[in-house]
Every structure is written in structure tokens, then in C-alpha cells.
């Protein structure tokens, strides 16, 4: 079976757990022996692991015809896309998108992040999905989270192939119930068009059924997992450099993750003992607020903000920690606690 999969992140360039989950899932699918996956991301860098899947960059897929020669295409897309694929995709441009801003190859520019023009990028990504769906052979469409639901819907409408949407979280989780109506509408549209829905936990399944009014028969829970650690990771030493106990939060520093509770709890602990240090590893829109909160509680000298961490950095932090804390107010299925448990 061939799957056309849409996702917003893929390692090593990730911004959260979505890319990590996508990597593990596609790796597991490839291990079944009868699955071939083509994974579409907004902006590939060329250093992604392609040993078990194909990667197509939405930002390398033409939506406007440009008369460019082979050598130029090869140089511009070096390490990301073969010229043959570029020309094949160009032959499947299905409408006039010349009124939209594109580059010298007739492609949209994508940040691949979560910027202020995110809705514009989501729309452009869905346009690209139409070009790819017309040119690629596949049996099923798989869309990860709301950002790629419009792309999945478009691919289904063009080809009639079945659509599976994979719900890693809903806006009820991300917003503490203060739902963004635009995001909610995109989520609802994706679920309504889906032939089947995968959720990462029974909690998320209940949310999908109750809040999005989906038929329970078409919603299945498939839990996340982690890959067994390599011996080199297991052998990482504890490099904390202090005798103090270390308590760690690792995740997106956002409203959903309850990061302010971690800071407040740290302040209460430090009222009783001073031989503890606290690490807040990650990044997000509440990071500056958490730095200010730590200063207001006069605990900045015991608090360490590392910024975003990935790969081996994550395991180095866990190896140097005594306690991992997950104060999330809503957690569909956290991958970080599994990674922490792997480190003991």
C-alpha cells in the first residue's frame, strides 16, 4: 500500500512533538514491509532521513509554470528534489496561480514554522497538495493535525482516495477551552471529510466524539511510542556539574503545558530548601512571561531556561535530572514523559 502523508514537521528540524511522532509512525509503517510512504512537508532542508520514505517539499513543488533549464533546477534543489520530479510535478499544475507570489521556480516560499502568516501557508500548502496528488501514485491519504487537513481534503476531492486524519491534539487542548473559531472550523472540516480518524489517546478520542460530533465507529486510538534508545544515548554521562537536585520541565512553553504551575511550584519548594535547581527546557510564546515570573518570585538564580532542545540534547538534560515534571493542563499524549522514563 502507498500512503500520501501530509505533515508540518519532520526531524531533524522540529518545533515540538508533532515531528517526532510523525517520524516514529512512518518508521513503524515502513517496518511492516508492505507500506510505502511519501511524506510532504512545507520546507525540507535536505538532511532528513529518507532511508524508509520519500520526502517531497511543498516549497520545492511548482504551482506556476517557469521555463527553467535542467542544470539550474538541479543546482537550486540540490539535496532536496531531483529535477525529473520537479518537471513531472510541473506537468500537473492544474490551475492559474500566477496571481500569487512565487519564486524563480514557480514555487511558494514556506517558513515551515508557526508564524503570523500561518493560515496563508496552510492555504498555499493545500494548493501544492493538489499538484502532488495529481502526479503521485497512492492508495490512501494521511494528514497530521489541523495544519494539513485542508491539504488532505483537497487531495481526496481530486482523487477520490480515502482520507485518514491523525489528531495529535485539538484546539480544546491547546487553548484551555478558549477555542479559536478558525482553527476549530478547520479541525471540524477535516474530521467531517475523513473516512477515518486516528487519535493519540482515549482522552482525545472522547474529545473528537463529544466536541466535534464524530461517529465513534470511525475514531480509533493509536497511542504514540518511542524508539528504543541507542547504546550511545544510554551511556550518556550526568554532566550537571552541581551537587544540587535537578527538577526539569521539557516541552513547549505555552498555555497548554501549564508552565506557570512549574514556576510557582519551584518557588514553594525553594521556600523549604535551597539545594534544588530547576530547568525549563523548551521555547514558546510564554517563555518571556515565565522568565519574568521567575524573577518576580526571586528564584532566577535557581532557574535555568535552556531554549528549544532536540535530539541528543534532550537526553543530556534528562540524564542530568532527578525529577521530570509534566504540569500540562491538557495532554493528549505526551512523548516527553516516555523519553524521560527511558532515561530512568
How would you label these PLM feature ranges?
Residues 198, 241-266, 279:
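Conserved donor-binding/catalytic core segment of Leloir-type glycosyltransferases
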Residues 35-133:
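A conserved catalytic-core segment of Leloir-type glycosyltransferases
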Residues 203, 225:
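Carbohydrate-associated surface elements
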Residues 329:
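Aromatic "clamp/platform" in nucleotide-sugar-dependent glycosyltransferases that forms part
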Residues 308-309, 316-321:
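Short alpha-helical donor nucleotide-sugar binding micro-motif in glycosyltransferases
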Residues 289-309:
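Nucleotide-activated donor-binding/catalytic signature segment of Leloir-type glycosyltransferases, i.e.
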Residues 334-337:
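Short glycine/serine-rich donor-binding loops of glycosyltransferases
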